């Protein structure tokens, strides 16, 4: 008698419940692909922030600083010497040949300060004063105010406006790391040294600069009396990454904000309509990404 094909046959041995061959490897590949995609998107976002979006951030800071400095100049309260708060506006910079106009110079040359504009190096006299004044600026990000500085020609005008008046400098030369330094200016003379970075090859090489550029300009006449100097910045070089506890603490908090924003977006995606989740969640996630990028950029060399 033949067996009924519709009846279930019971197997007395052990049942192999493992997934079919190859499924585990496929899941690993899918997970790895998602991780690589996420990393690529994060790197792409950070490059977009550095090369494009950071310019809007500096433009906003410059507008605020310009209004603050103009008010101080009108009231006669702009600084003429130490102490000067880090990040405070100290001068207006114009370089006609490079189309640099009314650029606000802030106090300090750390990465945090150079996000707002060119920075005056602590420990040197303020622009326009007797002695050597050093002003550093970025070449690639945050508006790249000194991107064309290596191409400046001898004799180009550099005009600086401070609480002590308007001062005109003439460029005398460009030098790089290892080149001989010019002799100190004589009594009653002033020099302005503009500093930025440059790379070799494509424009992307500026993200990893290899050389520091120094442009020396001599004051034509009428150096102002030098005010008190602040303590020199202990940071060894403007091309070195600087990690401080404050920036790390701020970055940790910003990452928590980003994780919270992502968690909220996922929750809204599963509970609300897709349109409502995008409208409510996308701006919050972008703002958190912007915050993380802005703080994270402070860990990079100050001149890029």
Explain the meaning of each model-derived region.
Residues 247-268:
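Selective detector of the "anchor" transmembrane alpha-helix that sits immediately C-terminal
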Residues 16, 21-250, 296-304:
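Solvent-exposed, non-transmembrane regions of membrane-associated and secreted proteins
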Residues 1-21:
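Acidic/Ser-Thr/Pro-Gly-rich, low-complexity N-terminal segments
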Residues 261-304:
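Alpha-helical transmembrane segments forming the membrane-embedded cores
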């Amino acid at each position: 008698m033949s067996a009924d094909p519709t009846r279930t046959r019971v197997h007395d041995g052990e049942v192999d419940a493992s997934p079919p061959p190859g499924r585990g490897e496929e899941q690993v590949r899918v997970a790895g692909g998602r991780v690589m995609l996420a990393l690529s998107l994060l790197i792409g976002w950070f490059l977009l922030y550095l090369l494009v979006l950071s310019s809007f951030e500096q433009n906003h800071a410059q507008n605020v600083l310009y209004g603050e400095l103009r008010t101080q100049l009108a009231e006669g309260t702009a600084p003429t010497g130490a102490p000067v708060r880090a990040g405070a506006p100290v001068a207006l910079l114009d370089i006609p040949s490079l189309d640099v106009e009314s650029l606000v110079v802030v106090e300090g040359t750390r990465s945090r300060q150079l996000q707002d504009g060119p920075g005056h190096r602590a420990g040197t006299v303020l622009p326009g004063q007797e002695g050597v004044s050093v002003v550093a600026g970025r070449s690639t990000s945050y508006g790249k105010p000194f991107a064309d500085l290596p191409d400046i020609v001898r004799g180009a005008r550099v005009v600086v406006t401070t609480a002590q008046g308007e001062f005109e400098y003439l460029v005398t030369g460009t030098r790089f790391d290892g080149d001989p330094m010019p002799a100190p200016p004589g009594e009653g003379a002033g020099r302005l040294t503009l500093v930025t970075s440059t790379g070799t090859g494509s424009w992307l090489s500026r993200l990893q600069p290899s050389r520091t550029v120094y442009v020396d300009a001599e004051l034509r006449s009428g150096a102002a009396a030098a005010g008190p100097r602040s303590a020199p910045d202990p940071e060894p070089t403007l091309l070195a990454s600087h990690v401080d506890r404050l920036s790390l603490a701020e970055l940790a908090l910003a990452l928590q904000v980003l994780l919270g924003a992502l968690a909220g977006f996922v929750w809204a995606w599963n509970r609300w309509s897709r349109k409502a989740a995008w409208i409510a969640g996308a701006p919050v996630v972008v703002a958190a990404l912007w915050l993380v990028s802005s703080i994270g950029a402070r860990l990079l060399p100050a001149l890029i």
